[in-house]
């Protein structure tokens, strides 16, 4: 009888391990869009004809661990001493940043867009939902300051995973003037829990997934908490979130705003779902951004 119980427990352990490692692989994998596919999506949803007319410079930056990040610099046709680095969302690539790039160009910024780790033209790898990605962004900030002279204002702007990455980067106290975080998550556990509720899957699978992710990839889901980077933060942050976002709930931005120590704003865009605030109400979005940046400039 004891032998049978041991065999059953052993089989259950094997099943749990298979489920856990499969779940970890699925959760941390990146279904990549091609650059052409991402560009077509942008063209179908708003005008990007201005992009082809820009002077652009492509280059790569070696991150903290030697990983190469593909970057594109969008030159403002006007003399500018303001720069912004825009981080796109999960599965997307640099073209996902274009919906924000035009706003910054119109405000007199040079714009830097890039492919996040594991996305776009970069080498395939797994996603750590802001952990490694934040260190990549820090490297880009440092590279930008060394590459371009006369920078008076440098900020970062992110959408979804890019927003979480931008917030998580604050733990390193980067030399930047502002952060714009659009529909970012405060911790990946909450996003996945929300998804499990919708699919009626047992919540306990997340803990198993987290353990297996740590074993296989070296990072647990519990480490993927951008909100922890806001403790003691004094860099101004503009949080924007679609009021009807069903994927990353607006309360993520609300919690993060409550956590930061510095100046912050939170704007919920009515009727906007995930990552579509700038498309749902571009005029309001541009006005909120312009007024926030003016307040930052007035206090520099």
Regions found by a protein language model. Give the residues of each.
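Short beta-strand/loop motif that positions the catalytic acidic residue
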Residues: 232-234, 239-241, 245
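Conserved alpha/beta-hydrolase
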Residues: 104-123
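Catalytic histidine-centered segment of alpha/beta-hydrolase-like enzymes
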Residues: 272-286
């Amino acid at each position: 009888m004891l032998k049978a119980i041991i065999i059953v427990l052993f089989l259950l352990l094997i099943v749990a391990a298979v489920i856990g490692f499969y779940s970890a692989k699925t959760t941390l994998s990146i279904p990549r869009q091609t650059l052409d596919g991402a560009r077509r999506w942008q063209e179908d949803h708003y005008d990007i004809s201005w992009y082809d007319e820009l002077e652009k410079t492509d280059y790569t930056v070696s991150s903290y661990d030697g990983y190469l990040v593909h970057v594109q610099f969008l030159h403002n046709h006007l003399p500018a001493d303001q720069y912004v680095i825009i981080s796109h969302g999960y599965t997307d690539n640099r073209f996902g940043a274009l919906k924000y790039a035009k706003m910054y160009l119109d405000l007199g910024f040079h714009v830097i867009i890039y492919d996040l780790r594991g996305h776009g033209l970069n080498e395939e790898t797994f996603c750590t939902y802001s952990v490694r990605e934040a260190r990549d962004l820090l490297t880009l900030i440092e590279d930008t300051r060394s590459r371009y002279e006369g920078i008076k204002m440098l900020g970062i702007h992110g959408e979804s995973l890019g927003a979480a990455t931008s917030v998580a980067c604050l733990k390193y106290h980067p030399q930047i003037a502002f952060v714009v975080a659009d529909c970012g998550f405060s911790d990946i556990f909450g996003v996945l829990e929300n998804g499990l509720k919708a699919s009626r899957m047992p919540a306990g699978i997340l803990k198993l997934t987290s353990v297996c992710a740590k074993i296989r990839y070296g990072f647990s889901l519990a480490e993927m908490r951008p909100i922890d980077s806001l403790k003691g933060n004094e860099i101004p942050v503009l949080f924007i979130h679609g009021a009807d976002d069903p994927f990353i709930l607006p309360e993520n931005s609300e919690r993060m705003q409550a956590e930061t120590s510095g100046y912050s704003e939170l704007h919920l865009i009515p009727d906007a779902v995930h990552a579509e605030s700038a498309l749902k109400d571009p005029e309001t979005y541009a006005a909120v951004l312009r007024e926030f940046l003016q307040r930052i400039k007035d206090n520099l």
